Curated annotation (Swiss-Prot):
Binds 1 divalent metal cation per subunit; can use either Mg(2+) or Mn(2+). Homodimer. Keywords: Hydrolase, Magnesium, Manganese, Metal-binding, Nucleotide metabolism, Nucleotide-binding. NCBIfam families: inosine/xanthosine triphosphatase (TIGR00258), PRK05074.1 (NF003459). This is Inosine/xanthosine triphosphatase. Its cofactor is Mg(2+); Mn(2+).
Length: 186
């Protein structure tokens, strides 16, 4: 029996993002082979998005870029983008990620759980630093954004950037898995 191959393209070469998309799809389609690749895709927003709106737009821009580039090559079945950002909410600053998934002519959007941030970290971000660099300095790590991320550091490894992305991707896939009942939007 031949297994179905699902080709996915991730709008990043970051192994955390590629692994998260691969793991999510393997959970959703356990009888399929997941063929994943990443590509550099511009977000069109600041390197460290500071609002919910910019973070969402960055993920959408990355997915659209991947889809446009792929029209000249072989097309993927699904396109994924994960854009991490921060915002200051009523309860304080927090980081989160938006997930954008392109499939045929459909676009699905999801958002990860949020992680409250210490005010000193948020102030450094307001001054123009990226979260990964701030966390590397604070915890004396190197390139944490391609490992457990701020999530891994602040939860003592009980959650990671990858696990957060994986869960968010699975949830964002719901409209694509059930297109008939998601036909209408608000």
């Amino acid at each position: 029996m031949q297994q179905n191959i699902i080709k996915i393209k991730v709008g990043s070469k970051n192994p955390v993002k590629i692994n998260a998309a691969t793991k999510a799809m393997a959970q959703l389609f356990p009888d399929s082979i997941i063929d994943a690749s990443g590509m550099d895709a511009p977000s069109g927003v600041a390197a460290q998005p500071m609002t919910d709106k910019d973070t969402r737009q960055g993920a959408i821009n990355r997915v659209h870029y991947c889809q446009q580039q792929d029209q000249q090559d072989t097309q993927a079945d699904y396109y994924f983008a994960m854009e991490g950002g921060v915002d200051c909410f009523d309860f304080g600053p927090a980081t989160f990620a938006y997930i954008a998934i392109g499939h045929k002519d459909q676009l699905a959007i999801g958002r990860s759980a949020i992680l409250p941030l210490p005010m000193q970290v948020y102030r450094a971000l307001e001054a123009g630093e990226e979260l990964g660099h701030v966390m590397d300095r604070l915890f004396n790590t190197v390139n944490i954004k391609q490992k457990g991320g701020a999530i891994g550091l602040l939860t003592h490894g009980h959650a990671t950037r990858e696990s957060n992305y994986t869960q968010a991707i699975i949830l964002a896939m719901a409209p694509l898995l059930n297109p008939d009942i998601y036909a209408q939007t608000c």
